[in-house]
Structures are given as structure tokens and as C-alpha cells.
């Protein structure tokens, strides 16, 4: 949540005052960063490259995070984006093997899936990346401390080391980059459930899985486990999963999940979990009973700020525990800053990297920079994936100052016509009729994330629908549909409600 922003002039004055103070006060570091995830490492390296003396602390490495373990690389590298994507790749091969038969591949005998082998490969990769991040810090002359950091003053950080000893360091600037952690709802028997942390490191593959949640983590793990052969039941509170995404895309994702064999339970929660000899008995909010080998709670994440001593120092937090910052990522304490999930702005790794880069440029690069949150693309790596950039149809109508034009293309991908898989792709463009600018794009289908990255550049540059139309497509490809949608699917009059075709 943003607090009152400093103007560029105020920021420069504050920076000048800080420089003045530096001549009178000696600090151990120009910058001390708490948290060596994507945002923290980026801020540390770029600040050091600008001449700053930088220290950073991070909890000891472990695939499953807790209050006392973590690891350089943070959630994305160790227990988030990277290991999850590896499992998505692994799960996708199941369907690919089925589809291969109609492409002439004779697959004789049983095709077995070895969960433990994939798990080991995943662990090897995150260890490799963990070491790369450490080398990046070392190469930038950033001093890395292993231990838990907490702020004990406007310019002082205390690090509790592995052996329990505490060492304090002073710094002209302190950056909070501690990320977020998974949370569990307080349902009876909740201790029997796991979060996404544990889901990435299960010793045994679950043959029966129940997932509670309707967000991207929930649908991704449902897709992963189903793709690997598990029976999966997905429970969520709304009528459709993926609240906040385009409704038409949400409906297609739901159909695809069901088409892949996932049992959907909309407008349903879990009431109780009970340990039995046969597994975990799950009672739904409608009184139905299920049995599972694993129950995943994918019900949101909270800022990882509880143990930082922020309130004692006077740093303002919102009700969820997120650090309040201005447009430059500065807190109400001039020497303390925060980036990434700890601020609960847009909780994506590339956004944390952007915020960290802006921080380094502002504080040590002499170039005050504000993070730009417009047209941030994102993807949900369900199978097949969903990717979006800009406004959904619903958001466009809400913010409209004139009529909105919606262009859609739904089709069976060329690959599916031979394999026989009945799974449509859908592409969508939202256009402001008054300016002809494309203000939103969505795609659900194979390679959606790879395609959407290019579309995001176009939206960032302010591309018009006419410019899309004048672009020559790559044929045959799914991507060419984005430049061949000539006919308006529907026009939404100013102040009207969106109407989807589903």
C-alpha cells in the first residue's frame, strides 16, 4: 500500500541531507539489505555497481521455508516460479505422450512416471541457481551474511547467526526485501494440510490430491498433479477460478481443467480435515466426504514482515503486515526502504526486480526512478497456460471513457487437429474505440506466456489496433491470430456491462 509520496524535489533534498549526514556519521555499509531473494539480490548488486558498500543477510538454505530457514534466491528460485515450472514441464509430457500416438509414435508397454527422479532433478537445479546467486553477490563485492536480520534502529540491523550469536551493523540505508510466505486458513485439522512449499518437495507422489484455492497456485498444482496421473479435486469459493482475471478466460480455464480430468467444486470450501488409516478424510462445506493422500492449501500469501521489529522502529505497516512505501519504495522512515512482496503491490518476481532497479538508481545512481506498474504481463502455468497483459474486459469497461471493442479468436490449435485432443485456444484483444489503442490482451492455449511477452511490448509502446492489423503474421502459428482479428466480436457501449460469449 502506498503512503504519501515524496516529490522528485523532496527526494533530491532528502538525498542531499543524507549525503550531508554521511560526512558526520560513519556507517558500516551504505546499504544493508534484509532478504536475498530476487528483489534483494538485484538491489544489492546494482547498488554496489553504483559504488555503494553493500551488505545483505539471508536465512540458511532449505527448500521449505520457515521463520528460521530460507536461502539465497528466495521464493522464486527455491520454492516458487522455477521449481514449479520444472514440475509443469514434467506434467506436460504426460499429455504429449498421449498425443504422440496420432503423430506416428508407437509407444509400446507401460510408460511409468518417476516422481523421485524429477524431484532430484528439480533440487539439483535450484541448488545450481542458489550458487549462481551467491556468485553474483560475490562478484559485485556484496558481503553476504547467513542469518536472520531485524531492524533495531533507523540505521541499524541486527543479524542472528546460525550459532545464535547476534551481530549489529549500521547502514546509511536499509532495504527490506523479505518477500511473502504461504498462509493456511484456520480450518479444523489444518495441520494435516500442506502449502506450496511442501508441495514442491513431497517425498512420495500423491495418487489422490485435494487442492483448496482458486488462485494461480491452486490451478497450477491441480494441473501438475493431474498431468502426472493423480486424481485431483479442486475446491474454490467463487463460481470460477482465477478471480481478477478476464471472466471469459476464467471460464475457458475451468473447462480445460475439467477436460483434463480435474474435478471442480465451485462455491465450495473445506470444513474439516481428519487423519485416517486410508489418508486424510476431507469434509467439504456442503458436507460431502473425500479421502486424499495430500491436501494443499493454496489460499494466499502474506508479507514476511512479522519478525523484522518494524513497528518498534516506527515503520508503518498496513493491516496485512505489508510495508507502506511511496512511489520510490521509501517508508515513512527516510533511511528505510522496501521492495517486492513485502510491500504487497504486484507480487511478481519481475516486478520486484523492477522495483529493486528503481531503488538502486534512485538512491545510489543519481537518477530518481519510479516503478511503472502499467501493462505488467503475467501468466498462469496451468495446462494449457493462461497469459495476460493490460486490462481485462471487465476492468476496461470499469475504467472506460468511451466505447470498448472486443476482438476474440477461438480455435482448435493445428497440433490438436492431428492428435485428436479437444481443447480450444482463445485469444482476445480489448481496444479503446476512441483512441484505437489496444489496452488489453489475453490468451489461453499452448505457449501463451511466450507469445504474450511480445504482445506486452506492443502495449507498452502504445500500439493501436491498426498497427496490429498491419503486422504480417507468422504462418502457420497460433500467434498470428493476434494480427488477423479483423471483425469485432462485440462492442460495449460506454457505461454498459461486459457480455462474454461463454
Swiss-Prot record:
For this protein, the record's PROSITE patterns field holds: PYRIDINE_REDOX_1
Q: Describe how the cofactor binds.
A: Binds 1 FAD per subunit.
- Family annotation (InterPro entries): FAD/NAD-bd_sf, FAD/NAD-binding_dom, FAD/NAD-linked_Rdtase_dimer_sf, GSHR, GSHR/TRXR-like, Pyr_nuc-diS_OxRdtase, Pyr_nucl-diS_OxRdtase_dimer, Pyr_OxRdtase_I_AS
Instruction: Please provide one cellular component term from the Gene Ontology annotations of this protein.
Output: cytosol
What EC numbers are recorded for this enzyme?
A: 1.8.1.7
List of residues binding glutathione: 38, 133
For this UniProt record, the keywords arranged alphabetically read as follows: Cytoplasm, Disulfide bond, FAD, Flavoprotein, NADP, Oxidoreductase, Redox-active center
Fill in the misc note: The active site is a redox-active disulfide bond.
What subcellular compartments does it reside in?
A: Cytoplasm
- Coiled-coil intervals in this record? none
This chain belongs to the protein called Glutathione reductase, cytosolic
GO molecular function list: flavin adenine dinucleotide binding; glutathione-disulfide reductase (NADPH) activity; NADP binding
Lineage of the organism: Eukaryota, Viridiplantae, Streptophyta, Embryophyta, Tracheophyta
Where along this sequence does the record place binding of FAD?
38-39, 58, 75-76, 84, 149, 341, 349, 475
The entry's family comment says:
Belongs to the class-I pyridine nucleotide-disulfide oxidoreductase family.
Amino acid at each position: 500500500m502506498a503512503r504519501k509520496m515524496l516529490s522528485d524535489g523532496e527526494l533530491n533534498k532528502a538525498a542531499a541531507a543524507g549525503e550531508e549526514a554521511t560526512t558526520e556519521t560513519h556507517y558500516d555499509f551504505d546499504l544493508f539489505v534484509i532478504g536475498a531473494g530476487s528483489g534483494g539480490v538485484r538491489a544489492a548488486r546494482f547498488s554496489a555497481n553504483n559504488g555503494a558498500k553493500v551488505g545483505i543477510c539471508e536465512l540458511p538454505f532449505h527448500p521449505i521455508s520457515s521463520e528460521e530457514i530460507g536461502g539465497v534466491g528466495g521464493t522464486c528460485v527455491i520454492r516458487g516460479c522455477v521449481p514449479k515450472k520444472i514440475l509443469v514441464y514434467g506434467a506436460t509430457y504426460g499429455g504429449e505422450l498421449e498425443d504422440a500416438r496420432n503423430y506416428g509414435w508407437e509407444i509400446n508397454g507401460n510408460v511409468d512416471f518417476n516422481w523421485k527422479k524429477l524431484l532430484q532433478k528439480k533440487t539439483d537445479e535450484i541448488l545450481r541457481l542458489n550458487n549462481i546467486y551467491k556468485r553474483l553477490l560475490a562478484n559485485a563485492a556484496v558481503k553476504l551474511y547467513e542469518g536472520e536480520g531485524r531492524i533495531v534502529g533507523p540505521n541499524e540491523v541486527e543479524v542472528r547467526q546460525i550459532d545464535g550469536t547476534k551481530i549489529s551493523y549500521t547502514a546509511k540505508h536499509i532495504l527490506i526485501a523479505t518477500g511473502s510466505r504461504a498462509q493456511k486458513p484456520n480450518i479444523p485439522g489444518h495441520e494435516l494440510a500442506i502449502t506450496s512449499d511442501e508441495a514442491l518437495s513431497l517425498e512420495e507422489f500423491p495418487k489422490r490430491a485435494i487442492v483448496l484455492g482458486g488462485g494461480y497456485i491452486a490451478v497450477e498444482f491441480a494441473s501438475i498433479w493431474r498431468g502426472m496421473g493423480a486424481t485431483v479435486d479442486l475446491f474454490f469459493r467463487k463460481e470460477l477460478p482465477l478471480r481478477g482475471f478476464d471472466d471469459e478466460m476464467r471460464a475457458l480455464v475451468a473447462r480445460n481443467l475439467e477436460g483434463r480430468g480435474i474435478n471442480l467444486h465451485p462455491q465450495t470450501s473445506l470444513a474439516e480435515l481428519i487423519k485416517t488409516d486410508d489418508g486424510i478424510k476431507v469434509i467439504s462445506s456442503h458436507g460431502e466426504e473425500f479421502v486424499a493422500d495430500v491436501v494443499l492449501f493454496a489460499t494466499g500469501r502474506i508479507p514476511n514482515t512479522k519478525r523484522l521489529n518494524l513497528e518498534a522502529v516506527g515503520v508503518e505497516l498496513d493491516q496485512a503486515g505489508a510495508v507502506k512505501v511511496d512511489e520510490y519504495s521509501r517508508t515513512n522512515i527516510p533511511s528505510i526502504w522496501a521492495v517486492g512482496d513485502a510491500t504487497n503491490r504486484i507480487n511478481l518476481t519481475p516486478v520486484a526486480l523492477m522495483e529493486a532497479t528503481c531503488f538502486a538508481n534512485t538512491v545510489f545512481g543519481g537518477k530518481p526512478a519510479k516503478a511503472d506498474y502499467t501493462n505488467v504481463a503475467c501468466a498462469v502455468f496451468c495446462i494449457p497456460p493462461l497469459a495476460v497483459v493490460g486490462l481485462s474486459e471487465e476492468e476496461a469497461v470499469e475504467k472506460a471513457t468511451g466505447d470498448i471493442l472486443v476482438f476474440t479468436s477461438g480455435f482448435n490449435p493445428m497440433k490438436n487437429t492431428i492428435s485428436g485432443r479437444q481443447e480450444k485456444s482463445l485469444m482476445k484483444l480489448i481496444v479503446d474505440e476512441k483512441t484505437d489503442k489496444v489496452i488489453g490482451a489475453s490468451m489461453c492455449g499452448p505457449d501463451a506466456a511466450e507469445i504474450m511477452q511480445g504482445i506486452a511490448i506492443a502495449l507498452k509502446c502504445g500500439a493501436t489496433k491498426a498497427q496490429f492489423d498491419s503486422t504480417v503474421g507468422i504462418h502457420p502459428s497460433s500467434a498470428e491470430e493476434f494480427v488477423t482479428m479483423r471483425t469485432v466480436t462485440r462492442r460495449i457501449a460506454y457505461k454498459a456491462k461486459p457480455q462474454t460469449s461463454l
